[in-house]
Swiss-Prot record:
Molecular-function GO terms, alphabetical: serine-type endopeptidase inhibitor activity; toxin activity
Domain BPTI/Kunitz inhibitor positions: 25-75
Tissue expression remark: Expressed in salivary glands.
This protein's name: Tabkunin 2
Swiss-Prot/TrEMBL keywords: Blood coagulation cascade inhibiting toxin, Disulfide bond, Hemostasis impairing toxin, Protease inhibitor, Secreted, Serine protease inhibitor, Signal, Toxin
Cystine connections: C25-C75, C34-C58, C50-C71
A GO-annotated cellular component: extracellular space
Function: Potent anticoagulant protein that inhibits the hydrolytic activities of all serine proteases tested (trypsin, thrombin, elastase, and chymotrypsin), with the highest efficacy on thrombin.
UniProt organism field: Tabanus yao (Horsefly)
Domain of life assignment: Eukaryota
Signal peptide: 1-20
Compartments it resides in: Secreted
Amino acid sequence: MKVLSLIFVIFSVLVLFASAKDPVCDQPKAVGRCFAAFPKFYFNSSSGQCEAFIYGGCGGNENNFSTLEECNAKCA
């Protein structure tokens, strides 16, 4: 019985950590202060999806990915 309880606890912890989202994903979209026009992706926590935006080239935050795949791997 103790072994079964231990297995349940370990499984629960693994599920909890596997489903934990990176805090970067909760940051808002930030286009930056400059005036370049780089196509990027960010995770929209309201829609629960990665979305395209135009990045100005400087400033901003870490919720800024070069590809949709990179954004999905980190946040979705």
